[in-house]
Amino acid sequence: MLKKHEKFYYGGDYNPEQWDESVWKEDMRLMKKAGVNYVSINIFSWARLQPDEETYDFSTLDKIMDMLAENGIGADLATATAAPPAWLSRKYPDSLPVDKDGSRFLPGSRQHYCPNSKDYARLAAKLVRKIAERYKSHPALVMWHVNNEYGCHISECYCDNCKKGFQTWLKEKYGTIENLNKSWSTDFWSQRYYEWEEICLPGKTPTFANPMQQLDYKAFMDDSLLALYKMERDILKTYTPDVPVMTNLMGLHKPVDGFHWAKEMDLVTWDAYPDPFEDIPYAQFMAHDLTRSLKKQPFLLMEQAAGAVNWRAQNAVKAPGVMRLWSYEAAAHGADGIMFFQWRASQGGAEKFHSGMVPHSGDEESRNFREVVQLGNELKNLEKVTGSAYASDVAIVFDWKNWWALELDSKPSSLVTYIKQLLPFYRVLHTQNIGVDFIHPDEAMDRYKVVFAPASYRVTKTFADKVKAYVENGGYFATNFFSGIADENERVYLGGYPGAYRDILGIYVEEFAPMKKGAVHQIRTGYGDAAIRVWEEKIHLKGAEALAWFKDGYLAGSPAVTAHHCGKGKAYYIGTQPDEQYLSSLLKEILKEADVRPALDAPRGVEVAVRKNGHEKFLFLLNHTDQVQFVDAGGTYPELIYGRTEAETVRLSPRDVKILQVIEK
């Protein structure tokens, strides 16, 4: 995956330019003590590298790169384009982005550039070329890091450059203005266009903007950011074709289509910042699986906090053992490296209260640094794990374009949001220790025994046909309410809901009945009554059988959850948002029927995850509780972290982790 990738990577963002050179020597000593072998540098250094448009100064970066090489530490060398210098904004004010109200953003923080600014792109390209020329053969160079967290702060711009770019993008997509009018349903509200130049960005309008205009604009902005990444990547590849190139994604980050971007990267990395106030941050765990799934290969955890962050309203610190536990959680789900932001906590600037691997005190005996040292030295034992695959028989469909479409305005209920619909399914599977891949609608489904597609509102005919073939050939498929409703042009499938899925599911939904916020109703199930929220609907059986029934109001007695035998497989439909206890029982039943089982039985709160490398299997056992737990491993196996053979009954201390190495015969 990485250049000379023979070990598990460990380190963090290193910003020595913020410190006097007298501190650097101490940094090298502490890095060696902590087992650091890899650092990200130069991410926010443009202003130092280029004091004006004609002048470049690489003297400090030269020293940093040489120092890393001398100490055997690899460099993830960034292109420094994430924060343009003040002189650029002053000289080229139209490089600054514009918000929906028409106000231009000011410099003074970061990411203050319009994705379609020709001046920004020209100057960024020139800088990247100089960096690539200078360091292409440097012994410290391991990987290129393009920009930083695209779309984190500025994912949309409403300037004239973007307006013209959007018009050009639309011409390329649709070919003719009539094709656009048809796709956008412009005969509604007298929105028909006759010239491309008539089309505006979906900015501030009296009421709801055209839905397809909004969706195309989101895709255009995603493409615009990706074009900047590809520009830098192509320059780097010209000088170093064999050095991996990536940028750090942000997991469940709505503006940037991860599947779209992953095709353009040599490996995928992401920045994870779970909230320590959550006992088990399932959304972050889900993002690990999503990130790995973007290329179906190991990823790097490029940033996490050693303790607290600084940008929430209340910034909890990670309790003793939590940083270590959550780091191994990333490794269990496919990470081949664990990195932090940042190495040394900053003395000044906006993130000075964001924890570092080295705290403000510099105290080697602080809990913060002792945990950093412990983890770094333990990870040296994971070389065998690097490059191994994550084992999963179950997939969840994830589609950014569907996410964008589902959460547009003017839908039946604003309570129906994408991640909130996916997360209960993921959480149930995680607690049952069922490995999960995420798949794009264009990917093959056949290798999975079960495929879940919650909240799949936007469905192409091609995908619906693929699902039907999958089920007919023996697959198990499950979706829920408000799915199969609209096509890729945001046009409703006629003939009755759930549109594209009607035949597969064997049902007809006559009408939606969204629930009031906070309302709780009941359904009758084979496991007893269960609470439901958010949504009800009138379902008619057209070949399916009912598994649960609504109990309240005019829907009382009508089906709420259904199953439909279709060919050799089965398709399930959940017409409401049930409580997690019922969802867990239902999913367990589906998994059992599809012959999907966890690798080991474990007590609640103990996670079992599997990575495989040929006949070698690595069982990660993670205790997410504050109690001692025991797991029957079914045999005695070598344990990688502690370097000893574990008894058949494995003892896990509170928040402890063990990794069993199993050779399959």
Swiss-Prot record:
Which UniProt keywords are listed? Answer: Glycosidase, Hydrolase, Metal-binding, Zinc
List the GO biological process terms: galactose metabolic process
**Pfam families, per this entry?**
Glyco_hydro_42, Glyco_hydro_42C, Glyco_hydro_42M
Q: Which residues are involved in binding substrate?
A: R110, N148, W311, E351, K352, F353, H354
Which residues take part in binding Zn(2+)? C114, C157, C159, C162
Q: Name one GO molecular function term.
A: beta-galactosidase activity
Please write the reaction equations for the catalytic activity of this protein: Hydrolysis of terminal non-reducing beta-D-galactose residues in beta-D-galactosides
In short, the EC number is 3.2.1.23
Q: What is this protein called?
A: Beta-galactosidase LacZ
Native species: Heyndrickxia coagulans (Weizmannia coagulans)
**Which gene name belongs to this protein?**
lacZ
